[in-house]
Amino acid sequence: MAKKIDGYIKLQVPAGKANPSPPIGPALGQKGVNIMAFCKEFNAATSNQEPGLPIPTEITVYSDKSFTFIMKSPPAAYLLRKAAGIAKGSGTPNTAKVGKVDRAQLEDIVKTKDADLTAADLDAAVRTIAGTARSMGITVEGV
């Protein structure tokens, strides 16, 4: 018989840097999950990724306090900031442009996020990421 699901927890955890301090500890502690076990498993699973890369993680907690987790691809906004070489997006994206990306950089981001995007083809996915870039005040070239 399948385990009974007690709840879900969604967190953005830096790759290789999961530790019991907030926000991870309190979120897992509320559900009674072994915090150190999660931290060790997560850090082992993300050991091959760039340290500090934010990884959206969905943790499924079962009634016996065991857990499983699914890691998604990093947020598009983070990847765009990294590609454009900026610290943060523009406060007024329509008037103040803060960086620039081209189609090749957008295609690299789409390949990174491929599993999480629902676009029908590469061109549609590139346009989706380009829209995110424009809303952050990043100039998009070649799209």
Curated annotation (Swiss-Prot):
InterPro entries cross-referenced by the UniProt entry: Ribosomal_uL11, Ribosomal_uL11_bac-typ, Ribosomal_uL11_C, Ribosomal_uL11_C_sf, Ribosomal_uL11_CS, Ribosomal_uL11_N, Ribosomal_uL11_N_sf
SUPFAM superfamilies registered for this protein in UniProt: Ribosomal L11/L12e N-terminal domain (SSF54747), Ribosomal protein L11, C-terminal domain (SSF46906)
Post-translational modification: One or more lysine residues are methylated.
GO biological process terms held by the UniProt record: translation
Assigned keywords, A-Z: Methylation, Ribonucleoprotein, Ribosomal protein, RNA-binding, rRNA-binding
One term under GO cellular component: cytosolic large ribosomal subunit
GO molecular function annotations of the record: large ribosomal subunit rRNA binding; structural constituent of ribosome
Similarity annotation: Belongs to the universal ribosomal protein uL11 family.
Task of the protein: Forms part of the ribosomal stalk which helps the ribosome interact with GTP-bound translation factors.
NCBIfam families, alphabetized: L11_bact
Matches recorded under HAMAP family: Ribosomal_uL11 (MF_00736)
SUBUNIT field: Part of the ribosomal stalk of the 50S ribosomal subunit. Interacts with L10 and the large rRNA to form the base of the stalk. L10 forms an elongated spine to which L12 dimers bind in a sequential fashion forming a multimeric L10(L12)X complex.
Protein name per its UniProtKB record: Large ribosomal subunit protein uL11
Gene: rplK
